[in-house]
């Protein structure tokens, strides 16, 4: 038999303090979850989950050919915070936005591998990945540069463009500059 070293009244106070700490921790955890969810919701959803990705790419290629541009496929989804951050980043930086608009047809190609999306969407996702050279191996978002004929010129792992919790303007601008039609002709 062990004899408690603290009197019963002290044990009761300790239990009360422990319960208060548990409640405080639970509240902080709930606040953190809500803030995390709101941070993702604050970014604009840029992926159209309803369209066929192959048809989306074909349409972009027609536009690119007419404009003498390349196509950039940002493959990912609204489920991917880094995909939404990249989309937000390139539209807010004037130099990057101009570089993209002048040289590329930029599309957000939705990727949803889940069977819950339906058999047709799963088939479309697999066909899109095959057509783009299996870019999913690099994670998301992944950037695929196509020439106006649909040939894959480059697949970019976007993690190399990151800086902190965002992206490096210098790296992103250099990436786009190196894959413009003019850069490949020189």
What are these regions (language model features)?
Residues 37-41:
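Boundary at the C-terminal end of the N-terminal hydrophobic targeting segment
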Residues 97-123:
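Thiol-based oxidoreductase modules, predominantly thioredoxin-like and allied folds used
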Residues 84-99:
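Typically the conserved alpha-helix immediately C-terminal to a functionally engaged Cys/Sec
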Residues 17-24:
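Positively charged n-region of N-terminal signal peptides that target proteins for export
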Residues 53-71:
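A short beta-strand-turn-helix
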Residues 138-184:
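Non-catalytic, surface beta->alpha helical segment in thiol-disulfide oxidoreductase systems
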Residues 67-81:
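Short active-site neighborhood of thiol/selenol oxidoreductases, capturing the structured segment around
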Residues 24-33:
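Sec-dependent N-terminal signal peptides
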């Amino acid at each position: 038999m062990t004899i408690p070293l603290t009197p019963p009244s002290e044990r009761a106070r300790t239990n009360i303090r422990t319960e208060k700490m548990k409640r405080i921790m639970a509240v902080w955890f709930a606040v953190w979850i809500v803030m995390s969810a709101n941070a993702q919701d604050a970014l604009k959803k840029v992926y159209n989950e309803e369209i066929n990705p192959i048809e989306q790419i074909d349409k972009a290629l027609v536009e690119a050919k007419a404009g003498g541009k390349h196509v950039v496929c940002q493959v990912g989804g609204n489920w991917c915070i880094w995909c939404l951050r990249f989309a937000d980043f390139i539209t807010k930086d004037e130099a990057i936005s101009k570089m993209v608009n002048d040289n590329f047809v930029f599309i957000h190609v939705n990727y949803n591998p889940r069977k819950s999306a339906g058999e047709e969407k799963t088939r479309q996702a697999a066909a899109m990945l095959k057509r783009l050279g299996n870019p999913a191996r690099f994670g998301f978002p992944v950037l695929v540069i196509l020439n106006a004929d649909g040939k894959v010129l480059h697949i970019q792992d976007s993690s190399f463009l990151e800086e902190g919790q965002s992206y490096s303007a210098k790296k992103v601008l250099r990436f786009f500059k190196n894959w413009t039609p003019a850069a490949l002709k020189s």
